[in-house]
Amino acid sequence: MKLSHLDEKNHPKMVDVSDKNITSRIATASGMIYMSQEAFDVIKNNTAKKGPVLQTAIIAAIMGAKKTSEIIPMCHPLMLSKVETNIVEFVKECAFKLIVTVKCEGKTGVEMEALSGVSIGLLTIYDMIKAIDKSMRITDIVLESKEGGKSGKFVRS
């Protein structure tokens, strides 16, 4: 399989998407963060010294999606039309699941934007609570689904 990010001399390059059609692109990614009961309670009770953790993580996830092309070298800058977040609590596991959906009308997909949003959002939770629990675990950052483009639809089973 030939990698699209390498030229004929195996040097890295940004893929030329100028001949692609503009289509609707949407991708959803998710990830988990597990923590101690104390850290979970601080977040749930909104008593973290650094401020509202989940609200800040949502803003960070949106910013992370928007800034993807600045931190991942071969990603194209995209005009995003939507970044939507959802946080699900797992009380028994002392965990939160962050879900990020990104949409645009463009020539390339938004999978990396969704994955970046999840990563930055979860890292923000870690940053804001690390004084309480340095053993938090960020896991299972995955692409859940994507639509649009020549590769078609993908849904994680």
Swiss-Prot record:
Q: Which SUPFAM superfamilies match?
A: Molybdenum cofactor biosynthesis protein C, MoaC
> Do the record's keywords include Lyase?
yes
Q: What domain of life does the native source organism fall in?
A: Bacteria
Tell me the GO BP annotations in alphabetical order. Mo-molybdopterin cofactor biosynthetic process
Q: In which pathway does it act?
A: Cofactor biosynthesis; molybdopterin biosynthesis
Name the family the entry cites.
Belongs to the MoaC family.
Q: PANTHER family annotated for this entry?
A: MOLYBDENUM COFACTOR BIOSYNTHESIS PROTEIN 1 (PTHR22960:SF0), MOLYBDOPTERIN COFACTOR SYNTHESIS PROTEIN A (PTHR22960)
Give the NCBIfam families listed for this entry. moaC (TIGR00581), PRK09364.1 (NF006870)
Protein name from the UniProt record: Cyclic pyranopterin monophosphate synthase
Q: What is the lineage of its organism?
A: Bacteria, Pseudomonadati, Campylobacterota, Epsilonproteobacteria, Campylobacterales
Q: Which gene encodes it?
A: moaC
